[in-house]
A protein has these predicted regions:
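Conserved non-catalytic scaffold segment of RNase H-like nuclease domains
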Residues: 1-104, 154-155
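Metal-dependent phosphoesterase core characteristic of DEDDh/y 3'-5' exonuclease domains
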Residues: 22-24, 32, 47-48, 84-184, ...
Length: 206
């Protein structure tokens, strides 16, 4: 199965990434469909399932992190016992941001030690569409975002969901308790990455 992941955070100042940053929501999209472009037309359960771990429902960041790791650990155990054929963790900028932050928070909240958390992520094969897109963006980090990926896909004839807001909007939504907008933003980003993943050959024209 493919596990699409996106983490939303709150930090008062942009430059305080990782130092004064709180995980407020983790979005998960489970995909049990065949790994083909035709699967991007399938969105119904049980083939495709959305899950959220949010601070406003669970009460505090530590529970968001611990419940997420309980969930991921269960999937890894199912894979090792061969109840699941494979697990691919897929996202956008997850190698540089989401996974390091989740590892940091897992240690902070005593979910597990560094070696155990690293092994957990190592056991889940990872695809990061930020990294895979760099060669098609002249290896430039600036302006390489979800919006760029959507435009690239659309230019190559792929029907991609429209983004809802951006990561910059999350701070204001959180402060104004507009949690439904954060969830909508998560949902659309997850769906976008899924369509990109299923159609990667056409996206990159390869």
């Amino acid at each position: 199965m493919r596990l699409y992941i996106d983490v939303e955070t709150y930090r008062p100042r942009k430059e305080e990434a990782f130092t004064r940053e709180k995980i407020i929501a983790i979005g998960i999209l489970e995909d049990w469909t065949p790994y083909t472009p035709d699967s991007s037309k399938i969105w119904d359960e049980p083939d495709v399932r959305l899950h959220y771990f949010t601070e406003w429902e669970l009460g505090e960041e530590s529970r968001v992190v611990s419940q997420f790791y309980d969930y991921l650990g269960g999937l890894i155990r199912d894979w090792k016992s061969r109840r699941i054929d494979f697990i691919n963790v897929v996202g956008f900028n997850i190698l540089r941001y989401d996974i390091p932050l989740l590892t940091q928070k897992g240690i902070e909240y005593n979910v597990a030690g560094l070696a155990e958390l690293n092994k957990l992520w190592y056991d889940a094969y990872t695809i990061d569409y930020f990294q895979t897109t760099l060669p098609f963006h002249d290896m430039r980090f600036k302006e390489l975002n979800i919006k760029y990926l959507v435009e690239k896909a659309e230019n190559n004839g792929i029907d991609v969901p429209e983004p809802f807001g951006s990561g910059r909007d999350v701070k204001d939504w959180y402060e104004n308790k507009e949690y439904d907008k954060i969830l909508k933003h998560l949902e659309m980003d997850l769906k976008i990455v899924r369509v990109i993943d299923l159609n990667y050959k056409q996206v990159y024209d390869i």
